Structure formats: C-alpha cells, structure tokens
C-alpha cells in the first residue's frame, strides 16, 4: 500500500507480497537491475507456473503464482526506491499481466476440459473484477497525492518521463488500450460518478481488494493445491456478480 499517504492506507488483501517486494527492491536498489528486469522475472515466474500446471505439479505452480505476485509488486517498489517512475514499466507490467492471465485460464480450461465460452467468460470476469479494484484504487491515489503514473482514464498517450523513450511508451500504451479498453469502458459505464464522489471508507476498499490480481492468483494457487481446479472457472464466473454488488453499495452509501 506504499502508493498512498499513510493516513489513507487500507488493508489490501491482494498486497500480501509487499513486504517481500520491498526487501527485493532495497536489495536491488544499488545494482544494475531495473524494474523492467523484475517485470521480466515475474513473466518467467508466470510461465513456470503454467508449465507446472500442465505437469500436474500444483504445489510448484502455486509457488510460482505467488512468486509472480511478489515480483509484480517488486518492480514498482524498485522504481520508487530508485526514484525512476516509468510509463514503459507501468504499461509493460499491465500488458504482461493480462497475457499471463489469459494463458493461465486457457491452461486451466485445458486441464479441466472446460468449454471455450466458460473459460473466456471466467477470464473476462477476472479482468472486470480487477478493473473495478484498480478504478477505485487509482481514484483514491490521485485524490490523495499518491503515485500518479496510473491514471483514472487512460485516454491519451502520456509523455515519456526522463530516462525512457517516447516510442516505447507509445507502443505499450497502444497495447494497453487494445487489451484493457473494453474493461475500462464497462466499469466507467457502470460507475461513472465514482471519481467525483466522496472517499470510500477503508473497510469498503479492503473488501474490494479481493478483486486485486494478487488475491485472485492466491485463490487460484489455493484451489490448485486443494484439488479444486475444476472449480476455478465456475468460481470466477460466479464471483463476477460481486462487481455489480460493490458498485451498488458504493452508489448507495458513498455517493456525493
């Protein structure tokens, strides 16, 4: 929760890897390694998790899924301790996340003989859940002077920051818009007033944090080791209902 001022931090259930991520970032602070290297590390961890799933090595798969979550936090932490924020890193991180999520659900669908549409809508639901969490979280960060490399509305290509190339930012932003645009539009359509409403209380944000990718991967890892892989796709299909429940709660109790 280092992206928020102390007085506005909440318990983020998806951010369990942050303490280890900070240790990794501080260890790498004065080395040649960059946040991009750490992002590549979590991509490798994600593919190792997929390989272990295919080999029915579910404990190992769970380990690599959690390692992926930790490294996913560590790249941002490293950018902060090196004081080198980057749109390149921000969009590469997001593009890598959605591609790995797609491959993970394809793999789970293959292992459980799930039909194509169930697999697709479970993946779609997972992304929609994550988008709602990121939407509320980004609004909170921008309101209280937290990290602003993520914007509430990703409508225009940002200007490259010091140390990065505009062509890289432009390319990755284009990929980001292509992959995430539909989810952003759906969530904004469902709750367009959120940005101008009063601040959501910490307890509500903690509840919504179950939609954070770290918590979602933890659930998948847990279901794999518990022998519940056949329930992963149905779970994320049903869990998408909570998107509408959370939005209804926010509009009812925390609107202006």
Predicted feature residues:
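Juxtamembrane helix-capping/reentrant segments at transmembrane boundaries
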Residues: 75, 79, 83-97, 151-156
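C-terminal membrane-associated helical module and adjoining short loops/tails
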Residues: 1-19, 139-256
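Alpha-helical transmembrane segments
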Residues: 109-140
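Select subsegments of transmembrane alpha-helices in polytopic membrane proteins
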Residues: 35-39, 92-98, 205-214
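Hydrophobic, membrane-inserted alpha-helices
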Residues: 24, 42-50, 100-107, 215-223
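Membrane-embedded alpha-helical segments that form the functional core of polytopic membrane enzymes
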Residues: 35-88, 104-105, 121-124
């Amino acid at each position: 929760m280092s992206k928020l001022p102390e007085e506005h931090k909440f318990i983020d259930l998806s951010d369990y890897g942050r303490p280890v991520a900070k240790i990794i970032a501080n260890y790498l602070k004065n080395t040649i390694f960059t946040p991009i290297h750490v992002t590549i590390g979590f991509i490798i961890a994600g593919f190792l998790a997929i390989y272990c799933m295919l080999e029915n090595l579910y404990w190992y798969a769970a380990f690599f899924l959690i390692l992926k979550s930790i490294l996913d936090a560590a790249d941002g932490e490293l950018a902060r301790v090196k004081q080198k924020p980057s749109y390149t890193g921000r969009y590469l991180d997001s593009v890598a996340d959605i591609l790995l999520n797609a491959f993970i659900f394809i793999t789970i669908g293959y292992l459980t003989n799930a039909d194509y549409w169930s697999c697709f809508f479970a993946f779609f639901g997972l992304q929609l859940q994550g988008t709602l969490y990121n939407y509320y979280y980004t609004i909170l960060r921008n309101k209280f002077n937290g990290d602003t490399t993520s914007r509430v509305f990703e409508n225009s290509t940002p200007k490259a920051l010091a140390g990065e190339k505009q062509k890289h930012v432009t390319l990755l932003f284009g990929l980001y818009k292509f992959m995430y645009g539909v989810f952003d539009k759906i969530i904004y359509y469902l709750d367009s007033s959120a940005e101008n409403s009063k601040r959501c209380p910490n307890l509500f944000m903690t509840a919504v944090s179950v939609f954070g990718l770290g918590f979602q991967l933890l659930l998948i890892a847990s279901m794999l080791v518990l022998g519940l892989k056949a329930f992963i796709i149905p779970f994320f299909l049903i869990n998408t209902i909570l998107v509408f429940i959370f939005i209804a709660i926010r509009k009812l109790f925390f609107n202006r």
